[in-house]
Every structure is written in structure tokens, then in C-alpha cells.
């Protein structure tokens, strides 16, 4: 189920504060956050946010298409290395 429209988007207060400071100072360095659950707001456009994926912070550059999505969608937590190759290949 989606979030109720009357509630509005969720965004951590600490992240909003960091974004406001970065925009006021015209700071371009990434903003570190562990808040994967926060919704990307229009204020975030043009900023780089380093989102924690459980192991490291993945830099995510926010564009217009990302508004309304969650930060965690852009920092993958699982790495797929591929299935093991079948070594019993027989030629006929």
C-alpha cells in the first residue's frame, strides 16, 4: 500500500537540516546519511547524498526524475556475483 496523500512525504528532520545548510553555503560535497527511508524532496535536486547501504556510503546525485522516490532505492544493499558456471559441459 502507498502512503496516504493527506500525511505527505516522510523525510528525516536531520537530513532536511543538512540539506538546508548545504544549499545556504552552496556546498557541493556529499551529505552523509543513514536514512534510506527518507523521500527525495524537490529541495534535494542538484545535491549529492551519500546513502549508507550497510557497508559503505554510496554517492547518489539527485535529479528531477528521482523526486518522490526513497533514497534507499538508489543504493543497492545486495551484490550479485553470478551463479557458478557448470563445469560438466559435455560435447556430443
From Swiss-Prot:
InterPro entries per record: Ribosomal_uS19, Ribosomal_uS19_bac-type, Ribosomal_uS19_CS, Ribosomal_uS19_SF
MF-aspect GO terms: rRNA binding; structural constituent of ribosome
A biological process from GO: ribosomal small subunit assembly
Gene3D superfamilies named among the record's database cross-references: 30s Ribosomal Protein S19, Chain A (3.30.860.10)
Family annotation (SUPFAM superfamilies): Ribosomal protein S19 (SSF54570)
Keywords associated with the record: Ribonucleoprotein, Ribosomal protein, RNA-binding, rRNA-binding
GO cellular component: cytoplasm; small ribosomal subunit
Family: Belongs to the universal ribosomal protein uS19 family.
Protein function: Protein S19 forms a complex with S13 that binds strongly to the 16S ribosomal RNA.
Entry protein name: Small ribosomal subunit protein uS19
Organism the protein comes from: Polynucleobacter asymbioticus (strain DSM 18221 / CIP 109841 / QLW-P1DMWA-1)
Record gene name: rpsS
Amino acid at each position: 500500500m502507498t502512503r496516504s496523500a493527506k500525511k505527505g512525504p516522510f523525510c528525516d528532520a536531520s537530513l532536511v537540516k543538512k540539506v538546508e545548510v548545504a544549499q545556504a553555503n552552496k556546498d557541493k560535497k556529499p551529505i552523509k546519511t543513514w536514512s534510506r527511508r527518507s523521500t527525495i524532496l524537490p529541495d534535494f535536486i542538484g545535491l549529492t547524498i551519500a546513502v549508507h547501504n550497510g557497508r559503505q556510503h554510496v554517492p547518489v546525485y539527485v535529479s528531477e526524475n528521482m523526486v518522490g522516490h526513497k533514497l534507499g532505492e538508489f543504493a543497492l544493499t545486495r551484490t550479485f556475483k553470478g551463479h557458478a558456471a557448470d563445469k560438466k559441459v559435455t560435447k556430443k
